[in-house]
């Protein structure tokens, strides 16, 4: 009988930690996979049409390890870029997501601890996740479940069909989190920046070239640096190809294919728990420029939930209970009086039906306020449900300003 390389590796790893035992391809049956496992996205891999994709990552062979710098609200240790996720991107363009509903777990993620700790006895892994893989709303388990359901179900080399028949149930889920944390621990972004003299501060800014040089030199390839609306460091993405199965941990750094949105100079790196102060430059009577700091006092980004309701707002501004929450971005207006809200769809505002909506067609959406974690519009903080499109799990419902005739709720960040 032929076994995939993944099946044998999983069998060897079932009751040991990856750091406790080393094995090589020579331990595996010679006819399981190519002797020299292909590198994902390489010409060699693309020509192996008849080779089981349990042997190498396909078609999503670009592997990203992504990290957050969540400074407001402060999330995770003060000296750590926290884990965002382990993602697989297509070799050409785009990325798969939610690839196999049969493998998904409950979005609350409560089962994850019992699988990792109770079933596999790996309390060390669970503790590492609790320390470094943080959700800025404090819902770590839900965040882990989201990352597994969206990305972990898409890796070809840890599909359940790749494992031996006597492999324990949930081995693929356990392997996803173990591999993600293992790679994360090899990419200490905070330490690499600190070694180059780049540390969190509100008293100075850094250039893009300084940050790139510090990280690229350590990683061995160009990394992707993402900034938020305040020109503060927000995320770091590390791109890889992988040789053979994910279980071999043979990740090969490659240059980022994404382009930074950070400015060439003036990049902020605020300490956690502090606000990245936007700067306004004005001319003094002597002709020199003066920098004025205006604290925003609001989070740079957040999900938007409804008080007393499940679900959240998606990027078009509608309420949805079955999909992924949208990340909303918040910025004080120049006069510091109101808030501009954006999603990936564009600026958010109130339409003619007094419904909250976000799109590129919206303009001048700066009449929002945030008070005690609640979103208001022109000092109105109560909202109601509006019209619904679709049905069942795909239904999307608009939210509108309350008029006193409905059961109202609040929009919470």
Swiss-Prot record:
Residues carrying sugar: 128
EC code(s) of this entry: 4.6.1.19
Cellular compartments annotated: Vacuole lumen; Cytoplasm
InterPro entries: Ribonuclease_T2_eukaryotic, RNase_T2-like, RNase_T2-like_sf, RNase_T2_His_AS_2
Keywords: Cytoplasm, Disulfide bond, Endonuclease, Glycoprotein, Hydrolase, Lyase, Nuclease, Signal, Vacuole
Catalytic residues identified in the record: 84, 147, 151
Catalytic activity entry: a ribonucleotidyl-ribonucleotide-RNA + H2O = a 3'-end 3'-phospho-ribonucleotide-RNA + a 5'-end dephospho-ribonucleoside-RNA + H(+)
Major location category of this protein: other
Cystine residue pairs: 33-55, 41-91, 54-162, 99-154, 227-262
GO function term, MF aspect, one: RNA endonuclease activity
Domain of life: Eukaryota
Family that this chain belongs to: Belongs to the RNase T2 family.
Main function: Rnase which modulates cell survival under stress conditions. Released from the vacuole to the cytoplasm during stress to promote tRNA and rRNA cleavage and to activate separately a downstream pathway that promotes cell death. Involved in cell size, vacuolar morphology and growth at high temperatures and high salt concentration.
Protein name (record): Ribonuclease T2-like 1-B
Protein's organism: Candida albicans (strain SC5314 / ATCC MYA-2876) (Yeast)
